[in-house]
Regions:
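Short, hydrophobic-biased segments on the C-terminal half of alpha helices
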Residues: 48-52
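Pre-recognition alpha-helix immediately N-terminal to the DNA-recognition helix
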Residues: 14-18
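Amphipathic alpha-helical dimerization/coiled-coil segments
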Residues: 80-127
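Short, cationic-aromatic polyanion-contact patches
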Residues: 10, 65-83
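Glycine-centered, phosphate/nucleic-acid-interacting loop/turn motifs that mediate DNA/RNA or nucleotide
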Residues: 58
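Short beta-strand "wing" residues that participate in macromolecule-binding interfaces
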Residues: 62
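Short acidic, hydrophobic short linear motifs in intrinsically disordered regions
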Residues: 26-35
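Short capping segments at the starts of secondary-structure elements
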Residues: 9, 19-27
Length: 127
């Protein structure tokens, strides 16, 4: 069986994944606390159920057999975000990265920092 598609993540599962990407390893309680610190107050049971679902889907791995269970992300942020973005380009923009860029840049004025980053990317030799 192949890896689950990144688009199979719900919004709440993605919130939980961000905790594991930033912390490395965590328990469900630690994930709940980190989310609460960032303004996403969820019950422990909700987070524990999301962690269980992420483990079953293959996004997290349980590291120990005794409580409290410690988990770590199996799929990296780069992998998941890249696949989600690729899926967005295919589904919404029919494969056109140019349309995506036009929409992104056309929506709001770029900050000086964003403009600098974009210029650096454009100066890189093509792959």
């Amino acid at each position: 069986m192949g890896r689950p598609a990144a688009r199979d993540l719900t919004e709440r599962e993605l919130e939980v994944m961000h905790v594991f990407w930033s912390r490395g390893e965590a328990t469900a309680a630690e994930a709940r606390d980190r989310l609460a610190e960032s303004g996403l107050d969820r019950t422990y049971t909700t987070i524990a159920n999301l962690v269980r679902a992420l483990t079953e889907k293959g996004f997290l791995r349980q590291l120990n057999d005794e409580r409290p269970f410690v988990y770590r992300a199996v799929r990296s942020y780069e992998d998941v975000s890249g696949r989600l973005l690729g899926d967005l380009v295919q589904r919404v923009f029919r494969g056109s990265r140019a349309q995506l860029l036009c929409r992104l840049v056309g929506q709001h004025r770029l900050s000086a920092e964003e403009r600098t980053i974009l210029e650096q990317i454009l100066e890189e030799p093509p792959r």
